[in-house]
Amino acid sequence: MEFIVCNGCGCSPSKRQFFITACSHVFCETCRTTPTADFCHLCKIPTKTLKMDASLPKNVKKMFGDVGVMSTDIHKRLARVIGFQKIQKSIQLKMENKKSVMRKEQTKKVEKKTEEMHCQLSKLTSFEENNRKKLEDIERENEKLRNLISALELKVASSRDIDDDEFFMQGTPTSSNPSVAGSDVDNDELLDYDLLGLRNRSDSSSSNCSSQSNRGGSLF
């Protein structure tokens, strides 16, 4: 430890026992005890001191180690730290890449599903439009059929009225005196028409004629 000298008088450790303070100052045994043992003559403050021998703690001994050896050891430890962190970064990067690939695949699936849904929606819209047009066509046809049915009902009703009128016209006798002698119309046939009470009138006419002929043969 050629770089170590007493921070008070400048002597080397080979001549006296040395002590190190908590504030990182080194004093020989003479300077340490002047004026008191636990006092730093440079910082002018009370402090703890340790005897510089084999009983020093490891963390304090490192302060007196060989710089070359320490640098090599530090380099090795630093290399291990760098290697460890590099491996961790590589693993993290692989995981991120894997997640990125999965996200891309999921995005493609979602886009494909969205496209399929748009296609289905377009088909449904077209199907709905076609059905609407068909319903409109059916409604127009139904309207035509309703109009046709109404016209047929009116025509049938009108035809029934005409048939009834013709029936009554055909059932009425055309002769004004069906019971007169010499008529070409058969009295039996005329008597069958009782629509207007002709039977009673025929019986009455026959009775009158008989009565007149009986009177014609008698003076009284």
From Swiss-Prot:
Disulfide bonds: none
Tissue: Expressed in the germline.
Any GO BP: reciprocal meiotic recombination
Zn-finger (RING-type) residues: 6-44
Coiled coil ranges: 124-155
Pfam families, per database record: zf-RING_5 (PF14634)
Chain spans, region Disordered: 166-186, 201-220
Subcellular location: Chromosome
A single Gene Ontology CC term: chromosome
Keywords, comma-separated and alphabetical: Chromosome, Coiled coil, DNA recombination, Meiosis, Metal-binding, Zinc, Zinc-finger
UniProt function note: Recruited co-dependently with zhp-2 to the synaptonemal complex between homologous chromosome pairs to regulate the formation and number of crossover events between homologs during meiotic recombination. Together with zhp-2, promotes the accumulation of pro-crossover proteins, including zhp-3 and zhp-4, at a designated crossover site along the recombination intermediate. Limits the number of crossover sites along a recombination intermediate by restricting the association of these pro-crossover proteins with other recombination sites during late prophase.
Descriptive protein name: Zip homologous protein 1
Organism: Caenorhabditis elegans
